[in-house]
Regions:
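Short, charged/polar, Gly/Pro-enriched secondary-structure boundary elements
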Residues: 143-146
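A surface-exposed partner-binding patch
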Residues: 1-141
Length: 151
């Protein structure tokens, strides 16, 4: 899969997922306590006095330079699928996947971060809040990332 295909796949996924959430939530996909730092993610009808606001899907502001800095900080390159996941839209998922808001675009990845796992070929990207499990990409078959499983 090319970078363009990975990004289009993620774009299609997010748009369908949020559309489904909006249908289930009577027009509201996700409600979150959003502050001023994430104002770009507020839906247009949000009241600034309310702590909880409807979260709208917006294009990611994460740049290639941001990804390069993250990769340098964590000591490994991101597979295309995770790169696309982080760079197509700012999004929110329940744990363990977590959120990717404007104010902290790598929040979920940093929350799951464990250098020992990376040293042994696993890239953590999601962590259950209760600490019961970490979701990782098995990097054993890189650069053939289509053969890299999720564990």
């Amino acid at each position: 899969m090319t970078d363009t295909q990975a990004r289009q796949f993620m774009r299609d996924f997010f748009e369908r997922y949020y559309q489904t959430l909006e249908q289930l939530g009577n027009g509201i996909a996700v409600m979150r306590p959003l502050g001023e730092s994430d104002k770009a993610m507020w839906r247009e009808d949000a009241d600034s006095k309310d702590e909880w606001k409807a979260w709208k899907l917006i294009p990611s502001t994460v740049t290639d330079q941001d990804i390069e800095a993250l990769e340098k900080a964590i000591g490994t390159n991101l597979p295309k699928c995770l790169n696309a996941f982080l760079t197509v839209y700012h999004h929110y998922f329940e744990n363990p996947v977590g959120e990717n808001p404007v104010s902290a675009p790598f929040k979920a990845v940093r929350n799951a971060w464990n250098p020992l796992l990376v040293k042994h070929g696993y890239l953590p990207f999601a962590w259950d809040d209760g600490g019961f499990y970490i979701r990782c990409i098995d990097l054993t078959n890189m650069p053939n990332e289509e053969q890299c499983g999720i564990c």
